[in-house]
């Protein structure tokens, strides 16, 4: 919890306040579905139309959520419920920019020094952090393109920790 509220409620409230978001489909672990529904009702989150059980990996959970949406959906905003302090202005700006792109991601420049390491834990290379960004959520995509990219990833058993990486590969 944060300030007495569950983290997921902070995230859902931020999304709920965005006029361009008309429907939300939270994805919960199967064993947390009842608790999730209870929280949504208790805290008056009205844009949730359904909740969906997650999968083994994050990618499976996102795919389950995407698969539950109406095929007439235009865009999707993917946000991790463990990022409770998302700024509404960031969500709005990402949605605004999707008209000119297939996807829009939130990211911050890397401040740490990043190294690649061989299997024996021996440093192989130091990467130039000027060209590195840490990707976060929200991530906004055109629904048909992201859904097709996810279908291809599933069929090829390609796994990534990030939705934009799936779009890079298949979108």
What residue ranges belong to the model's regions?
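N-terminal glycine-rich phosphate-binding loop and ensuing alpha1 helix
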Residues: 1-34
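Structural beta-sheet core signal
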Residues: 25-26, 78, 103-106
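Short phosphate-binding loop-to-helix
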Residues: 41-75
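Residue-level signal for inorganic ion chemistry
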Residues: 8, 65, 79-80, 109, ...
């Amino acid at each position: 919890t944060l300030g007495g509220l569950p983290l997921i409620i902070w995230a859902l409230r931020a999304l709920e306040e965005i006029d361009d978001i008309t429907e939300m489909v939270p994805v919960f672990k199967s064993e947390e579905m009842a608790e999730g529904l209870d929280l949504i009702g208790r805290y008056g989150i009205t844009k949730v139309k359904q909740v969906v059980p997650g999968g083994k990996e994050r990618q499976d959970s996102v795919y389950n959520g995407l698969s539950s949406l109406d095929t007439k959906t235009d865009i999707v905003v993917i946000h991790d419920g463990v990022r409770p302090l998302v700024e509404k202005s960031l969500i709005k700006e990402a949605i605004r920019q999707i008209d000119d792109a297939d996807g829009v991601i939130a990211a911050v420049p890397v401040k740490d020094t990043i190294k690649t390491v061989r299997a024996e834990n021996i440093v192989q290379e130091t990467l130039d952090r000027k060209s590195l960004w840490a990707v976060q959520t929200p991530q906004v995509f055109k629904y048909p393109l992201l859904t097709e990219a996810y279908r291809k990833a599933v069929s090829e058993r390609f796994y990534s920790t990030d939705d934009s990486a799936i779009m890079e590969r298949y979108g």
